Curated annotation (Swiss-Prot):
Subunit structure, interactors included: The RNAP catalytic core consists of 2 alpha, 1 beta, 1 beta' and 1 omega subunit. When a sigma factor is associated with the core the holoenzyme is formed, which can initiate transcription.
Stored InterPro entries: DNA-dir_RNA_pol_omega, Pol_omega/Rpo6/RPB6, RPB6/omega-like_sf
Gene3D superfamilies on file: 3.90.940.10
EC id: 2.7.7.6
Pfam families: RNA_pol_Rpb6
Matching SMART domains: RNA_pol_Rpb6
Catalysed conversion reaction: RNA(n) + a ribonucleoside 5'-triphosphate = RNA(n+1) + diphosphate
Species of the source: Yersinia pestis (strain Pestoides F)
Classification via PANTHER family: DNA-DIRECTED RNA POLYMERASE SUBUNIT OMEGA
Keywords linked to the UniProt accession: DNA-directed RNA polymerase, Nucleotidyltransferase, Transcription, Transferase
Name of the protein in question: DNA-directed RNA polymerase subunit omega
Single GO BP term: DNA-templated transcription
Function, in words: Promotes RNA polymerase assembly. Latches the N- and C-terminal regions of the beta' subunit thereby facilitating its interaction with the beta and alpha subunits.
Assigned GO CC terms: DNA-directed RNA polymerase complex
Amino acid sequence: MARVTVQDAVEKIGNRFDLVLVAARRARQIQSGGKDALVPEENDKVTVIALREIEEGLITNQILDVRERQEQQAAEIQAVTAIAEGRR
């Protein structure tokens, strides 16, 4: 299990307050959103996994925003397609 230093993660995000927000958001995605971890889990808790992803530069607030926007657009397209097919 690799040791996570918060300072390395802070340097990737900018400040510790934003780090807490991004790490919590990502940990929730992994825990309940069905998102897969981008780093080996190694029996770590989701918060540690989120910090490791941030530390490695795999996750930022902008990346999370883009992913959520893409998922929302895909869901909207799917809903519109289902409605259009129902009218035929």
